[in-house]
Amino acid sequence: MNVKYGLIISSELLKEKEPDGSYTFAGLTQKTFSSISEQSGQEEALSELGKRILHNLDLTENIIDFIPKVNINHYRISSSIFSLASDFSDSLIVKVSDLPNYKDILSKIRSIGFTARQNSVTLSVYPDSTNTLISDDDSIIERTISELNFHNWFFENAGFPSNASNPIIIKPLADPKIDSHKSTVECVQKFYENFQKLDEETQNRLVIQNEESGYWNAVNLFKYFHVYLNEKYDEGMTLSYSNTADDRNSSELEKGVSVEPIVNIGAFHETWKGVVPVFLWSEKTSASSKTPVDYLSNSIPDFNYGIKWECDVKKRDKAIIKFTMPQEEDKVTEEVITTITKNKYKKSRDSSRAFNALYDASSKPQN
């Protein structure tokens, strides 16, 4: 089967069996971090942040270990696993190396990489939506470069090859100033200038996706981010296709003649140079809504290309197994999930309860 389904961030199947929050990612806001620092000292705040990050990494590994059992072999990790340590938009800068459990975190990252490779699960990440390499604001560019390099640092430490098989997917998020070839070239050259400032391994992993509105529909993205950059610098970008973006922001090669999705999919597929592409598939609750449906109305079509489709649906893997295990859906829910939850993930549950209890105690107002 050419169609491979990918899970995005959370597992509803696991949450359903353990609704106490054990399978929910935990973060720490700058305000809460500062509050703990004021009440108990910065070491305590760093310790609390480190515990939450390790919980998130444990949960990530648990999901990666679980999804092959329901025939899902791709996983988009949360871009917020590291909470404040990967947030470069705040004035508070916390480095992972500052955390007291830094060595445990590194060990867990390596374990995640091993588990993914052992289970033939590929990973991707979709950084914060404010990331753009097209801007005249140096602070925006610096923040974007820092965050993209950070996600690359994770993949490097997990032991993955530095190529698009574990992509960091972003959108241009900036249109040409006017609708002309010259202005578009200036826009893309601005991107490329900043792209060159990224770590080499980050460049190898970076993938660009078409947008739901504005200039960067599928054809324009291919024309300039792949063809132009390839002709000009011998470095055309790898492109990720979004079916919703293509539907809402359709493409034309000739005026009045829309390009069919299969054509865009084929063009984008070729930019991956032999790596199985990671694309995005979704259905929304209405024509203008950004909210995905609970369940897909039909299976993802087979476009005669090997593709891993990140499946954007509210019910996550609970929706996906309707297509990956249609004859065994009830069995998966009742037997497989229960066994795995009770045995395999007890450690993650207990860890979550322990550090939440510690935080609840430390955050109570002092008399």
Q: What is each of the regions a protein language model found here?
A:
Residues 126:
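Conserved, mostly hydrophobic/aromatic
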Residues 142, 148-237:
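Eukaryote-skewed repeat-based solenoidal scaffolds used as protein-protein interaction platforms
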Residues 240-242, 282:
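Acidic/histidine-rich, metal-coordinating catalytic segments
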Residues 213-216, 242-246:
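Short acidic, Gly/Ser-rich segments with clustered Asp/Glu that frequently serve as metal-coordination loops
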